[in-house]
């Protein structure tokens, strides 16, 4: 509980600084929500890295079926107005007779950079890989807040900015901190943790934070996972050269 209190305090300090405001719209000129970046990497000519896989190739492993995509973003239950699932975030591609949703987050079209044809002299977030964005601070607060209703309201601060209506607010009432008995959810975790997980899934699709959330909470499995138990996969195998030469830190 002490570590949760400290995590809440630090995350709250970042939020209250107001240096990284939540964005209320996603456009093709700002697919990665650059103003929300607390820390990110610059990758020169990033389009040469991402375009072959995300733009030009029919790679089924990078696409998600429309039915599963709808489940991820709650499209039939209030999520249809969530801009994180919109046309600036994903595009459709026909792959082996099936329409898939393909991530557009790293598509460099529309950005301004000195090596791109539309450069105007104003930097807009081209060639950037986000590592920490401000929504994660809200999610840390929602996870650590001892008050269930306050936790739900903090989650909704991000959700509402993403276009979800206030009528679809998160329920922080009875059962919020009890094992989640809803169909399709991991009953090994509370409804609070599963609600935070769902927001990580929507917000950080293609960024990597969701993996570490699963790992930190030791999820046995998750939506669309082909394994019954993934826990042995959370620790990556050592690179061969480290194993061979004993550079293991042991």
Give each language-model segment a name:
Residues 72-73:
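Active-site-proximal, Lys/Arg-enriched surface segment
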Residues 1-66, 77-250:
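Acidic/polar-rich alpha-helix caps and helix-coil junctions
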């Amino acid at each position: 509980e002490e570590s949760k209190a400290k995590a809440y305090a630090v995350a709250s300090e970042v939020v209250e600084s107001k240096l990284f405001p939540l964005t209320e719209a996603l456009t093709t000129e700002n697919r990665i929500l650059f103003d929300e970046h607390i820390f990110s990497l610059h990758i020169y000519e990033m389009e040469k890295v991402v375009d072959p896989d995300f733009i030009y190739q029919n790679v089924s492993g990078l696409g998600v079926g429309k039915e599963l995509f709808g489940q991820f973003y709650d499209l039939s239950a209030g999520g249809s107005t969530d801009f994180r699932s919109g046309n600036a975030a994903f595009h459709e591609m026909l792959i082996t007779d099936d329409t898939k949703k393909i991530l557009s987050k790293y598509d460099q079209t529309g950005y301004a950079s000195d090596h791109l044809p539309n450069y105007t002299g104003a930097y807009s977030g081209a060639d950037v890989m986000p590592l920490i964005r401000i929504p994660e601070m809200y999610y840390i607060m929602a996870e650590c807040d001892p008050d269930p209703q306050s936790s739900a309201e903090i989650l909704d601060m991000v959700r509402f900015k993403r276009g979800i209506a206030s009528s679809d607010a998160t329920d922080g009432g009875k059962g919020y901190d009890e094992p989640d008995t809803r169909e399709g959810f991991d009953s090994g975790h509370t409804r609070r943790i599963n609600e935070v997980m769902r927001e990580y899934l929507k917000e950080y699709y293609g960024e990597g934070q969701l993996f570490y959330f699963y790992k930190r909470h030791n999820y046995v499995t998750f939506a669309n996972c082909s394994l019954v138990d993934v826990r042995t996969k959370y620790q990556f195998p050592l690179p061969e050269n480290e194993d061979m030469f004993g550079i293991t830190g042991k």
